[in-house]
Amino acid sequence: YFIDELKNWKHLFDAAVASSDRSSDLLTSCGIEVINLNAAPPIDFYIDGADEINPDRILIKGGGGALTREKIVAAASEQFICIADDSKQVEKLGIFPLPVEVLPMSRSLVARNLVELGGRPIWREAFETDNGNWILDVHGLLIEDPRELESTINDIPGVVANGIFAQRRADIVILGSNDGIRRI
């Protein structure tokens, strides 16, 4: 969607950094050069979607399984712009299951810890991230303090990253609806 439109504007930039192998393939198929983050100059902006967005521009991302790389690229970017349809906006995060990327050997340990936090983790079987890890989708987790919960989950041994984007929230959110677009 966005990448399809981006090909019409590729004359305005030199290259792109992709946050997933799938995005990299799409960019390349549109004739856009993809460079590794390690070889990239400072990144002016990162544009991506979200699974949930609260009024403070804190997000849940990772439904596609690329949350770790998305966090890295967002952290490396001067500005993080989130575009989504208005159905993704919620008052409180947690309706969408929270993706947690884990090292394969730690899946059960991490799952037990997530249960202690009040969640119901479900292993996303037959799925491997671009980093060779697994995803636990955590249902029913009460997300009162997204920033605190993001840190708490990241501190569990074996967790690579989780899909709460509170420490690096979006700078700009653009929501589309049948009535037009609005910015948060």
Which stretches of residues belong to each language-model region?
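Short active-site oxyanion
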Residues: 10-16, 58
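N-terminal active-site wall of soluble small-molecule enzyme domains
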Residues: 1-6
